[in-house]
Amino acid sequence: MNKLFSLILALFLVNSAVVSSLDSCSICVDFVGNSLNDLLNIILNSGVIGTCGDLCSAVPGGQIVDTVCDLLCDYVGVDEFIKLISDVDPDPIYICEKISVCKTNDNAAASLDLVQINPQNGTVGGTFTLSIAYTVTNTIATGQLAFNIIDPTGNAFGDAVLLVQQSPEQYTQQFQFQATPSEQESFPNGLYTVQALVCEGSCGSPHPNTYTLANGTTTFTISGADSSSMSGAGSFSGSSQSTQTGAASGSGSGFALF
């Protein structure tokens, strides 16, 4: 949450009355994504919540988080805010679109130019770099660039970055992960499939204004796994880093399509 605090504080200190739509959308998605579980627990355990202040004052994180929560909640009203947070499939991007902080574009368009992983033949414990290049041909209002990696047993892990007001041009993104076995992902020997997606809205979300604009795949292999540790299921829990070029807004978050 420190990154979120710093961004919000800087914006308020520079000019509390002027926050660009791009910054506002990113702040909203970060806040909802980071605070969603806390908000759900407060809603479920607090009984009747009469005001935004009642709800937001209980969210951990201090005065800045309280203020952001109040601003978003007051905009739509406490009842509608609670309804959005309590959705059966809560989605930070969709919630921020419904609050009218993030924009949508049903005509967004993009193509994938490159999906490449290095090394293509690696070992357990090694570091892998996934490079993705894509071209936006009609502005992505609020969306994601996401990837999923499926291991030889069918388990999947992935990541995604937020895209806000990406105008037509080419963009590149790199993700890194370390193939360190854990209870969640054992990194067995064999062939792995990489899926990359560019989306308007959250990739894989069932909500309106969500579209897969482009997708592509590649493969790589891992060897050197201890056969005694080749069981396990769940999502990736190793280290992950991402870098991005182009006029894009991005933030990392856990992601899985399946």
From Swiss-Prot:
Q: Where is the signal peptide?
A: 1-21
Presence of the UniProt keyword Secreted in the record: yes
Q: Enumerate the spans annotated as Saposin B-type domain.
A: 22-106
Q: Which residue ranges does the record annotate as region Disordered?
A: 233-258
Q: What are the recorded Gene Ontology BP terms?
A: actin filament polymerization; adenylate cyclase-activating G protein-coupled cAMP receptor signaling pathway; cell motility; glucose 6-phosphate metabolic process; glucose homeostasis; hypotonic response; intracellular glucose homeostasis; maintenance of cell number
- In what ranges is there compositional bias, type Low complexity? 233-248
Show the InterPro entries listed in the entry: SaposinB_dom
Briefly explain the null phenotype.
Answer: Cells form a fewer number of larger aggregates.
Q: Which residues are glycosylated?
A: N121, N215
Keywords assigned:
Disulfide bond, Glycoprotein, Secreted, Signal
Name the residue ranges with Gly residues bias. 249-258
Q: Which SMART domains match?
A: SapB
Q: Which GO terms describe its cellular component?
A: cytoplasmic vesicle; extracellular region
Q: Does the keyword Lyase apply?
A: no
Query: Where's it found, cell-wise?
Result: Secreted
Primary location group? secreted
Give the multimer and partner information.
Answer: Component of the counting factor (CF) complex, which includes cf60, cf50, cf45-1 and ctnA.
Summarizing the function annotation, the protein's role is: Cell-counting factor that limits the maximum size of the multicellular structure. May down-regulate the expression of gp24, which mediates cell adhesion.
Family, according to the entry, reads as follows: Belongs to the countin family.
Q: Any idea what this protein is called?
A: Countin-1
What would be the name of the gene that encodes this protein? ctnA
